[in-house]
Amino acid sequence: MFKCYNRPMLQLHKKNLFLFLMLFFALESFTEENPYVFIDNNAQKMVQVLTLEAALFETDRSLYEQKIKDIFEPMIDFRRVAASVMGKKYYLLASQGERSEFVLIFKDSLLDTYAETLAQWGDSTITTKFPDSKSNIYEKNVEVKQVLNTGSSKYPISYKLRRNEEGWKIVNIIINGVNLGLTFRNQFQALAVTHDENIDLTLQNWVSDAGDAGIS
Protein backbone atom coordinates (compact mmCIF):
# COMPACT_ATOMS: atom_id res chain seq x y z
CA MET A 1 0.00 0.00 0.00
CA PHE A 2 1.49 3.32 -1.06
CA LYS A 3 1.38 6.32 1.21
CA CYS A 4 0.47 9.61 -0.32
CA TYR A 5 2.24 12.59 1.24
CA ASN A 6 0.79 16.02 0.81
CA ARG A 7 2.88 18.81 -0.70
CA PRO A 8 3.84 20.48 2.64
CA MET A 9 5.08 17.12 3.96
CA LEU A 10 7.16 16.50 0.83
CA GLN A 11 8.63 19.96 1.08
CA LEU A 12 9.53 19.31 4.71
CA HIS A 13 11.28 16.05 3.80
CA LYS A 14 13.16 17.79 1.01
CA LYS A 15 14.17 20.56 3.37
CA ASN A 16 15.42 18.08 5.99
CA LEU A 17 17.33 16.14 3.33
CA PHE A 18 18.88 19.36 2.05
CA LEU A 19 19.95 20.38 5.56
CA PHE A 20 21.42 16.92 6.17
CA LEU A 21 23.43 17.04 2.95
CA MET A 22 24.63 20.56 3.71
CA LEU A 23 25.78 19.47 7.17
CA PHE A 24 27.46 16.36 5.77
CA PHE A 25 29.43 18.27 3.16
CA ALA A 26 30.25 21.00 5.67
CA LEU A 27 31.76 18.39 8.00
CA GLU A 28 33.67 16.84 5.11
CA SER A 29 34.99 20.27 4.12
CA PHE A 30 35.91 21.08 7.71
CA THR A 31 37.91 17.85 7.97
CA GLU A 32 39.75 18.59 4.73
CA GLU A 33 40.40 22.24 5.57
CA ASN A 34 41.32 21.81 9.24
CA PRO A 35 45.08 21.15 9.53
CA TYR A 36 44.75 19.87 13.10
CA VAL A 37 42.21 17.25 12.09
CA PHE A 38 44.36 16.38 9.05
CA ILE A 39 47.44 15.73 11.20
CA ASP A 40 45.54 13.99 14.00
CA ASN A 41 43.67 11.61 11.68
CA ASN A 42 46.88 10.48 10.01
CA ALA A 43 48.73 10.26 13.33
CA GLN A 44 46.09 7.89 14.68
CA LYS A 45 46.40 5.77 11.53
CA MET A 46 50.12 5.49 12.25
CA VAL A 47 49.43 4.54 15.86
CA GLN A 48 47.16 1.75 14.63
CA VAL A 49 49.99 0.40 12.48
CA LEU A 50 52.44 0.67 15.38
CA THR A 51 50.15 -1.22 17.76
CA LEU A 52 47.93 -3.53 15.69
CA GLU A 53 50.68 -4.53 13.27
CA ALA A 54 53.38 -4.97 15.91
CA ALA A 55 53.86 -8.65 15.04
CA LEU A 56 54.53 -7.71 11.43
CA PHE A 57 57.60 -5.77 12.57
CA GLU A 58 59.24 -9.08 13.47
CA THR A 59 58.00 -11.17 10.52
CA ASP A 60 58.15 -8.69 7.63
CA ARG A 61 59.79 -5.41 8.56
CA SER A 62 59.75 -4.09 4.99
CA LEU A 63 55.97 -4.48 4.76
CA TYR A 64 55.58 -2.95 8.22
CA GLU A 65 57.57 0.13 7.23
CA GLN A 66 55.71 0.34 3.90
CA LYS A 67 52.42 0.65 5.79
CA ILE A 68 53.86 3.69 7.58
CA LYS A 69 55.13 5.16 4.31
CA ASP A 70 51.70 4.76 2.70
CA ILE A 71 50.24 7.04 5.38
CA PHE A 72 53.09 9.53 5.61
CA GLU A 73 53.97 10.04 1.92
CA PRO A 74 50.79 11.92 0.83
CA MET A 75 51.15 14.29 3.79
CA ILE A 76 54.39 15.96 2.66
CA ASP A 77 55.13 18.60 0.02
CA PHE A 78 58.35 16.91 -1.08
CA ARG A 79 59.11 19.39 -3.86
CA ARG A 80 59.04 22.35 -1.48
CA VAL A 81 60.92 20.51 1.28
CA ALA A 82 63.61 19.26 -1.10
CA ALA A 83 64.15 22.80 -2.44
CA SER A 84 64.49 24.08 1.13
CA VAL A 85 67.00 21.35 1.98
CA MET A 86 69.14 22.26 -1.04
CA GLY A 87 69.11 25.91 0.03
CA LYS A 88 68.96 28.88 -2.35
CA LYS A 89 72.61 28.68 -3.43
CA TYR A 90 72.64 25.03 -4.47
CA TYR A 91 69.09 25.09 -5.78
CA LEU A 92 70.13 27.80 -8.26
CA LEU A 93 73.33 25.92 -9.13
CA ALA A 94 71.39 22.74 -9.88
CA SER A 95 69.84 22.05 -13.26
CA GLN A 96 66.10 21.41 -13.56
CA GLY A 97 66.87 17.71 -13.97
CA GLU A 98 69.02 17.66 -10.84
CA ARG A 99 66.31 19.43 -8.85
CA SER A 100 63.73 16.86 -9.92
CA GLU A 101 66.17 14.04 -9.22
CA PHE A 102 66.80 15.28 -5.69
CA VAL A 103 63.07 15.40 -4.98
CA LEU A 104 62.90 11.65 -5.66
CA ILE A 105 66.15 10.87 -3.81
CA PHE A 106 65.15 12.94 -0.79
CA LYS A 107 61.64 11.49 -0.76
CA ASP A 108 62.90 7.89 -0.65
CA SER A 109 65.56 8.57 1.97
CA LEU A 110 63.24 10.59 4.22
CA LEU A 111 60.46 8.00 4.10
CA ASP A 112 62.95 5.23 4.88
CA THR A 113 64.35 7.19 7.83
CA TYR A 114 60.94 8.18 9.22
CA ALA A 115 59.42 4.70 8.84
CA GLU A 116 62.43 3.02 10.45
CA THR A 117 62.36 5.47 13.37
CA LEU A 118 58.61 5.08 13.91
CA ALA A 119 58.90 1.30 13.74
CA GLN A 120 61.16 1.37 16.80
CA TRP A 121 58.65 3.32 18.90
CA GLY A 122 56.31 0.35 19.09
CA ASP A 123 53.37 0.68 21.47
CA SER A 124 53.09 4.47 21.60
CA THR A 125 50.36 7.10 21.67
CA ILE A 126 50.26 10.44 19.87
CA THR A 127 48.16 13.33 21.16
CA THR A 128 47.37 16.38 19.03
CA LYS A 129 47.08 19.78 20.70
CA PHE A 130 43.98 21.46 19.27
CA PRO A 131 43.76 25.26 19.58
CA ASP A 132 40.98 27.02 21.48
CA SER A 133 40.19 29.12 18.43
CA LYS A 134 39.65 27.86 14.88
CA SER A 135 40.53 31.20 13.30
CA ASN A 136 44.00 30.16 12.11
CA ILE A 137 42.73 27.16 10.12
CA TYR A 138 42.02 29.60 7.31
CA GLU A 139 45.61 30.83 7.17
CA LYS A 140 48.12 29.54 4.62
CA ASN A 141 50.78 28.48 7.14
CA VAL A 142 49.97 26.66 10.37
CA GLU A 143 51.92 24.90 13.12
CA VAL A 144 50.38 21.75 14.61
CA LYS A 145 51.85 20.40 17.84
CA GLN A 146 51.69 16.86 19.17
CA VAL A 147 53.06 14.84 22.06
CA LEU A 148 54.51 11.38 21.47
CA ASN A 149 54.21 9.11 24.51
CA THR A 150 56.43 6.04 24.20
CA GLY A 151 55.37 4.72 27.59
CA SER A 152 58.59 5.67 29.33
CA SER A 153 59.02 9.21 27.96
CA LYS A 154 57.10 12.02 26.27
CA TYR A 155 58.44 13.96 23.30
CA PRO A 156 57.10 17.10 21.57
CA ILE A 157 56.51 17.06 17.83
CA SER A 158 55.80 20.16 15.77
CA TYR A 159 54.56 20.05 12.18
CA LYS A 160 54.87 23.11 9.96
CA LEU A 161 52.11 22.97 7.36
CA ARG A 162 51.39 24.99 4.25
CA ARG A 163 48.19 24.94 2.23
CA ASN A 164 48.53 24.41 -1.53
CA GLU A 165 46.12 23.45 -4.31
CA GLU A 166 46.01 19.87 -2.99
CA GLY A 167 45.24 20.89 0.59
CA TRP A 168 47.45 20.90 3.68
CA LYS A 169 50.99 19.55 3.32
CA ILE A 170 53.87 19.21 5.78
CA VAL A 171 56.87 21.40 4.94
CA ASN A 172 58.95 20.82 8.09
CA ILE A 173 59.02 18.71 11.25
CA ILE A 174 60.62 19.45 14.61
CA ILE A 175 60.96 16.39 16.86
CA ASN A 176 62.09 16.84 20.46
CA GLY A 177 63.76 20.13 19.53
CA VAL A 178 65.53 18.74 16.46
CA ASN A 179 64.58 20.73 13.35
CA LEU A 180 64.67 18.11 10.60
CA GLY A 181 64.55 20.65 7.76
CA LEU A 182 67.53 22.57 9.14
CA THR A 183 69.40 19.36 9.95
CA PHE A 184 69.01 18.07 6.40
CA ARG A 185 69.97 21.45 4.92
CA ASN A 186 73.19 21.51 6.94
CA GLN A 187 73.92 17.96 5.77
CA PHE A 188 73.36 18.92 2.14
CA GLN A 189 75.63 21.95 2.40
CA ALA A 190 78.39 19.94 4.08
CA LEU A 191 78.10 17.20 1.45
CA ALA A 192 78.19 19.76 -1.38
CA VAL A 193 81.36 21.34 0.03
CA THR A 194 82.95 17.88 0.35
CA HIS A 195 82.31 17.30 -3.36
CA ASP A 196 83.53 20.75 -4.47
CA GLU A 197 79.92 21.89 -5.03
CA ASN A 198 79.41 19.24 -7.69
CA ILE A 199 75.63 18.79 -7.49
CA ASP A 200 75.63 15.46 -9.32
CA LEU A 201 78.12 13.90 -6.88
CA THR A 202 76.27 15.45 -3.95
CA LEU A 203 73.04 13.78 -5.04
CA GLN A 204 74.75 10.45 -5.61
CA ASN A 205 76.04 10.45 -2.04
CA TRP A 206 72.97 11.85 -0.29
CA VAL A 207 71.56 10.02 2.73
CA SER A 208 68.89 11.54 5.01
CA ASP A 209 70.13 11.17 8.57
CA ALA A 210 68.56 12.83 11.58
CA GLY A 211 69.64 10.13 14.01
CA ASP A 212 66.85 9.25 16.41
CA ALA A 213 66.04 12.95 17.01
CA GLY A 214 66.84 12.39 20.67
CA ILE A 215 64.12 9.78 21.00
CA SER A 216 65.06 6.46 22.53
Predicted regions and their residues:
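Bacterial N-terminal signal peptides that target proteins for export
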Residues: 6-17
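N-terminal signal peptide c-region/cleavage motif recognized by signal peptidases
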Residues: 26-28
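Early exported N-terminus immediately downstream of N-terminal targeting peptides
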Residues: 33-114
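Surface-exposed, charged secondary-structure patches
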Residues: 112-155, 205-216
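Short beta-strand edge/turn micro-motifs at domain boundaries
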Residues: 154-182
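Low-complexity, intrinsically disordered terminal/linker segments enriched in charged
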Residues: 172-216
